[in-house]
Amino acid sequence: MSSEVKFSPYEDAVAALVIQILGRTGVAGEVTQVKVKILEGRDKGRILTRNIKGPVRLGDIVMLRETEREARRITAR
């Protein structure tokens, strides 16, 4: 068993830079779909599409808990 004590929920999070805003999604448009570039960790330099809830703009740094999942593209019905 691990005897590690975690003091912060962001201890194992990875920093990512918002490089492009793709659009808004969600029932009321409360989620923004963005492209982010991973700044550290094993996926450093990788570009992902992610959904972010809350205010976001170009150049922001967001903390991602994991870098495996990628958001689906916004499509018109």
Curated annotation (Swiss-Prot):
Keywords: Ribonucleoprotein, Ribosomal protein
Source organism: Pyrobaculum islandicum (strain DSM 4184 / JCM 9189 / GEO3)
Signal peptide: none
Family: Belongs to the eukaryotic ribosomal protein eS28 family.
UniProt xrefs under InterPro entries: NA-bd_OB-fold, Ribosomal_eS28, Ribosomal_eS28_CS
Cellular component, GO, one term: cytosolic small ribosomal subunit
Keyword Acetylation: no
Lineage: Archaea, Thermoproteota, Thermoprotei, Thermoproteales, Thermoproteaceae
A molecular-function term among this protein's GO annotations: structural constituent of ribosome
Protein name: Small ribosomal subunit protein eS28
Gene3D superfamilies: Nucleic acid-binding proteins (2.40.50.140)
A GO BP entry: maturation of SSU-rRNA
Gene: rps28e
